[in-house]
């Protein structure tokens, strides 16, 4: 029974470790990843129905129904994409067990040839008449070869790290795949729009894995938000002073974040991604304080604007006039328009203006910062995998070279081979043999 199980295991390892299977799996992952790049991910159903109408499928087959049925709207979290990653990892592991590790073990064995006819079949062969086996061994040792001499036979090798390289390549790829899979299953992405002075929890989740956990034992606090402008008046950078508070309200981490400079806390990364203006604080007749909500409008070719409507009583007409307040940025300049879109005035924050006999002053512009909050436990594994991959590339430059020799009467038969840089190896060995002949003549 155990023999049959062992045979089945070896056969399975042989099939899964097939190079063609690994290449097919890798190409499939690359193809579906390309689909994930082309097809917008994690959008609502209406988006796909509008972008990929069922009545007119793209390329004749890519419709909203097909995308949703196959999970192409969320490729990286589908069961079949996860299965492909697992199969590729198993294939690489099987190849390592079936081919790379046995190859390394063979490289460490002492492989003596006992007949000069066998040496001649290797390819690069020499017959030396004027030197001894011990002199050859000394010369090889000075060239960093590991030399084993047994009677009139000699075996030497160097460049064993070159045999370790392929194993590290497979190990690094498996670690990278594990990191990607871990991130898909247990990571999450949240987007929060938080007003200045606001406190927030992670709640607006836009993407999460089946095993993801969103911690609620801390909260964020936006202490300040500001925008830096360049000389042309366009936005150069925007900054948020962000604090992390524990369950007792104590600050445990703080940092001024900006684009490409996030805050990190317990494996969660807070990125600065956007900003907006949410409210205007207004004082009327030095008595009434109100907050007007702002609506953002994108005008093609002109940029983004924020608009609020302020109803002001018109005593003469016994009606309310709607005054439109328009902002382009956080510089404090506010444009006031009548309901029929006539420009009434341009004021700054803190400046009084008379509207229909009422004293109106904008006391503050309340801005919001846009944060992307991301957790990806697989990232450290991906970094480790890529580091090992770079290390394996370095190791691959080591040529694994072997030299055999047999002393038969007065003739020393020498042969050698290498797995790469063959021309350079042939030059080195030929030079070595010529030196032996001339030195010990």
From Swiss-Prot:
Keywords: Chloroplast, Cytochrome c-type biogenesis, Membrane, Plastid, Thylakoid, Transmembrane, Transmembrane helix. It is a multi-pass membrane protein. The chain crosses the membrane at residues 19-39, 78-98, 164-184. GO terms for cellular component: chloroplast thylakoid membrane. The keyword Secreted does not apply. It comes from the Eukaryota. InterPro entries: Cyt_c_bgen_Ccs1/CcsB/ResB (IPR023494), ResB-like_domain (IPR007816). It is found in: Plastid, Chloroplast thylakoid membrane. The keyword Heme does not apply. One of its GO terms (biological process) is cytochrome complex assembly. May interact with CcsA. Required during biogenesis of c-type cytochromes (cytochrome c6 and cytochrome f) at the step of heme attachment. HAMAP family: CytC_Ccs1. Belongs to the Ccs1/CcsB family. This is Cytochrome c biogenesis protein Ccs1. It comes from Rhodomonas salina (Cryptomonas salina).
């Amino acid at each position: 029974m155990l023999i049959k199980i062992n045979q089945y295991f070896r056969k399975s390892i042989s099939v899964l470790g097939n190079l063609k299977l690994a290449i097919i799996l890798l190409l499939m992952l690359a193809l579906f990843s390309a689909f994930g790049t082309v097809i917008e991910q994690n959008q609502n159903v209406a988006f796909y129905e509008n972008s990929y109408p069922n009545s007119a499928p793209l390329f004749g087959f890519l419709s909203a129904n097909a995308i949703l049925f196959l999970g192409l709207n969320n490729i990286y979290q589908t069961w079949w994409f996860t299965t492909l990653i697992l199969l590729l990892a198993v294939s690489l592991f099987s190849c390592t067990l079936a081919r790379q590790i046995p190859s390394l073990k063979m490289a460490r064995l002492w492989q003596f040839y006992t007949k000069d006819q066998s040496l001649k079949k290797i390819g690069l062969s020499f017959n030396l008449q004027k030197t001894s086996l011990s002199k050859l061994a000394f010369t090889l040792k000075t060239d960093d070869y590991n030399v084993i001499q047994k009677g009139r036979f000699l075996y030497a090798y160097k460049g064993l790290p070159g045999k370790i390289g392929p194993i590290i390549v497979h190990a690094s790829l498996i670690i990278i795949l594990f990191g990607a899979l871990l991130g898909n299953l247990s990571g999450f992405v949240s987007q929060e729009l938080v007003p200045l002075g606001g406190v927030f929890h992670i709640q607006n989740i836009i993407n999460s894995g089946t095993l993801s956990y969103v911690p609620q034992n801390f909260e964020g606090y936006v202490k300040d938000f500001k925008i830096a402008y360049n000389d042309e008046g366009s936005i150069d950078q925007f900054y948020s002073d962000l604090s992390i508070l524990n369950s007792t309200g104590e600050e445990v981490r703080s940092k001024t974040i900006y684009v490409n400079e996030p805050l990190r806390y317990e494996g969660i990364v807070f990125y600065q991604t956007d900003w907006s203006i949410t409210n205007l604080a207004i004082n009327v007749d030095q008595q009434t304080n109100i907050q007007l909500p702002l609506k953002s409008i994108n005008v093609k070719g002109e940029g983004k604007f924020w608009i609020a409507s302020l109803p002001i009583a018109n005593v003469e007409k016994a009606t309310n006039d709607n005054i439109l307040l328009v902002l382009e940025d956080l510089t404090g300049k506010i444009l006031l328009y009548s309901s029929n879109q006539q420009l009434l005035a341009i004021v700054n924050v803190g400046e009084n203006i008379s509207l229909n006999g009422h004293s109106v002053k904008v006391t503050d512009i309340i801005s919001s910062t846009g944060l992307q909050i991301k957790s990806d436990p697989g990232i450290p594994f991906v970094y480790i995998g890529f580091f090992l991959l770079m290390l394996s590339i370095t190791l691959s430059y080591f040529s694994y070279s072997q030299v055999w020799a047999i002393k038969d009467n007065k003739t020393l038969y020498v042969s050698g081979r290498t797995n790469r840089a063959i021309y350079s190896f042939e030059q080195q060995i030929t030079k070595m043999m010529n030196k032996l002949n001339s030195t010990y003549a």
